[in-house]
Curated annotation (Swiss-Prot):
Renumbered residue ranges of the record's region Involved in Mg(2+) ion dislocation from EF-Tu: 82-85
Location in or out of the cell: Cytoplasm
InterPro entries, A to Z: EF-Ts_dimer_sf, Transl_elong_EFTs/EF1B, Transl_elong_EFTs/EF1B_dimer, Transl_elong_Ts_CS, UBA-like_sf
Primary gene name: tsf
PANTHER family referenced in this protein's UniProt entry, alphabetically: ELONGATION FACTOR TS, ELONGATION FACTOR TS, MITOCHONDRIAL
Key words, A-Z: Cytoplasm, Elongation factor, Protein biosynthesis
Function: Associates with the EF-Tu.GDP complex and induces the exchange of GDP to GTP. It remains bound to the aminoacyl-tRNA.EF-Tu.GTP complex up to the GTP hydrolysis stage on the ribosome.
GO cellular component term, pick one: cytoplasm
Official protein name in the record: Elongation factor Ts
Gene Ontology MF annotations: translation elongation factor activity
Protein source organism: Desulfosudis oleivorans (strain DSM 6200 / JCM 39069 / Hxd3) (Desulfococcus oleovorans)
Length: 198
């Protein structure tokens, strides 16, 4: 494909929120294929996010969300590098969506290292008993249990979870896309989820 039309660049910008030149570069690299260009920009965004991940995040907001007629409530602290970014609609939307994700999925922690050791050990023991009950050979038990623990992390760790609004990506992917979009490091610092009667 020779030249990339302005309408194609505009369509990609609307889909991804990326800058005009980034969209043009992605479309050129992907011969005008918009779906490949979206993936190209996502990969580029991950690289940008990795570069920014070491920066200090001392600004941000505490977002709250009340769900199901007041029966579930969430507070989440999301940090960024500057007060300016903390006030943007993109950042506020990210914090709001993360709070909604927490309300919907009740994660055990933000990342695998945040899952309480006693909960992890209890899960490991349950999985081990299940695998032994299935009659699997002893030399395979630990590998199978490790696989089940990885699945547990995908379900129980916020960053590893599928994003409920777009199951094709994880919350970690969504965070990286938002970092690429706003140009600053973002960190989900902590959260609390309350459910009536729990």
């Amino acid at each position: 494909m020779g030249t990339i039309s302005a309408s194609l660049v505009k369509e990609l910008r609307e889909k991804t929120g990326a800058g005009m030149m980034d969209c043009k570069e992605a479309l050129t690299a992907c011969d005008g294929d918009i779906e490949k260009a979206v993936d190209f920009l996502r990969q580029k965004g991950l690289a940008k996010a990795a570069k920014r991940s070491g920066r200090e995040t001392s600004e941000g907001i505490v977002e709250s969300y009340i769900h199901m007629g007041g029966k579930i409530g969430v507070m989440v602290e999301v940090n960024c590098e500057s007060d300016f970014v903390a006030k943007t609609d993109d950042f506020k939307e990210f914090a709001r969506n993360v709070a909604m994700q927490i309300a919907a999925t009740n994660p055990a922690g933000i990342a695998p290292e945040d899952v309480p050791a006693d909960l992890l050990e209890r899960e490991r023991q349950v999985y081990r008993a299940q695998v032994l009950e299935m009659g699997k050979p002893e030399n395979m038990v630990d590998k199978i249990v490790d696989g089940k623990i990885k699945k547990f992390f995908k379900e129980s760790c916020l960053i590893e979870q599928q994003y409920v609004k777009n199951p094709d990506i994880t919350i970690g992917d969504y965070l990286n896309e938002t970092v690429a979009k706003i140009g600053e490091s973002i960190r989900i610092k902590r959260f609390a989820r309350f459910a009536l009667g729990e």
